[in-house]
Amino acid sequence: MDWQTTSADTAPSSFITEEQDRSLFGKPPASGAWKESDPVGGRRFAGIGAFGFESGESLPFVRIAYETWGELSPARDNAVLVLHALTGDSHAVGAAGPGHRTSGWWQGIIGPGKAIDTDRWFVAVPNMLGGCQGTTGPTSIAPDGAEWGARFPFTTIRDQVKAQAAFADALGIGRWAAVVGGSMGGMQALEWAVGFPERVERLAVIAAPPHSTADQIAFNSVQLGAIRTDPLFHGGSYYDEKDGEGPHQGLALARRMALITYRSLSELNDRFERTWQSGISPLGDGGRFAVESYLDFHGNKFTRRFDANSYLTLVQAMNSHDVGHDGSGLAAALSRVTATTLVVGIDSDRLFPVDGQELIASHLPAALDGRVPLVVRSHFGHDGFLIEDDLIGGQLRRLFAA
C-alpha cells in the first residue's frame, strides 16, 4: 500500500520524504477543528435538542455531523451504524478535499460490493459527541458567544451512545441492522448492544475492550499531561490565538505517544530498524532516527486537523469506558446483548490486547464464534483494523450473512 495516498489514520509506518516534511512548513492553527466557515464537504447535520450528561451537566443544544452512503429502504430496516475511532470522523469514504483534510478511513470496507455493501445497506457514520469535525464539542460556540473549550461537560462512552440513539431517532431509525465499530468506536458499539439491545440486530466489536484498564489509562494520562502542560494551552482558552500560538506542541506530542501504541513492535522494527533520517547521524550530529521523523511528521500533521480540547474530552471518555459500570458488573451487562455478534481481536495489538476481546466473547449469548473471539494475524498492530481490508472485510461479510 502506498501510504501517501491513503488516510492519515490508515497509513502503515513508512519513511518520511523531504517533500512531505516541507508540506508542513508554516505555523499550525490554534485549533485544527472544522469550523462553520469551512466547506461542508459531505457532511449533513442532525439536531437532537437539549442533552443531559451522566455527570449531571447539560447542553442547551447538540448537533450531530454525519455522512451516509446507500439508500434507506422504505421499511427503514437496512440501516447500518458505523462508529469511528478516537481521531476519526464521519468521512469514512471519499477523497480528501474541501471540508475533509483526509480521505476516507474505511474505503476498503464500505462501498458497492464491499464488506459493508452500500448496494444493500444504508450506512450512517456520525462524528462522535465531543469531536471536532462538526458534531457538538469543545470547539462549538456556547450561548455566551465563546467556544465551550474546557467548559465542555465531562463526556463518557455512554453519553456518546445516548447522543447516537437520539441521532437514530432523528433519522427515523428504530433498529439498526448492524452496529459496527473499531477501537473507541468498538467501545460505543458494545455500549449500544448493552444499553439498547432491542435496537441492534447485529454487532461487530473490533479491537476494543469491555472496559479500560490501568495500563491503557496510564498511557492516556501521559498524553493528557502533554497537552495540559503545553504553555500555550492556557487552560483550554486558546481559540483566539494566532497561528503557531496554540497548544500544537502538546497535541503533537500526545499524537506521537499514541501512534506508538497503534503500531506493532515488529512493524516499527522491521520498517525503520536504526536507520537515520536523510543520512544525518542522530548520534551527536543533530540528525534524527527515521522512526523519530515518522512520529514527528504525523504528530505535526495531526495538529492541522484536530483540536486539543477535543482530544482531552475524547481520551477521557475512553478512560470512562466500562459496560458494567452501572453496578451490575461485566457478566450481567454482556448477558443483555441479544444481537448476533462478531468479536474481532488482532494478535499484534498492544493498545487493546486480545485478552479484552476474550473477556467480551466469553460472556456473550450469541457470538458468531462461540465463547472466543476471532483473532486475525496482522503485522500492523492495533491499526490493523484500518489497514487489513481483506482480513477485516472477510469477517464482516460473515456477520452480514448471518
From Swiss-Prot:
Pathway: Amino-acid biosynthesis; L-methionine biosynthesis via de novo pathway; O-acetyl-L-homoserine from L-homoserine: step 1/1. Its main location: cytoplasm. The active site is at S183 (nucleophile), D349, H382. It comes from Leifsonia xyli subsp. xyli (strain CTCB07). HAMAP family: MetX_acyltransf. Keywords: Acyltransferase, Amino-acid biosynthesis, Cytoplasm, Methionine biosynthesis, Transferase. It comes from the Bacteria. This is Homoserine O-acetyltransferase. It is an enzyme of class 2 (transferase). Its EC number is 2.3.1.31. Transfers an acetyl group from acetyl-CoA to L-homoserine, forming acetyl-L-homoserine. Residues 78-388 form the AB hydrolase-1 domain. It is found in: Cytoplasm. Homodimer. GO terms for biological process: homoserine metabolic process; methionine biosynthetic process. InterPro entries: AB_hydrolase_1 (IPR000073), AB_hydrolase_fold (IPR029058), HAT_MetX-like (IPR008220).
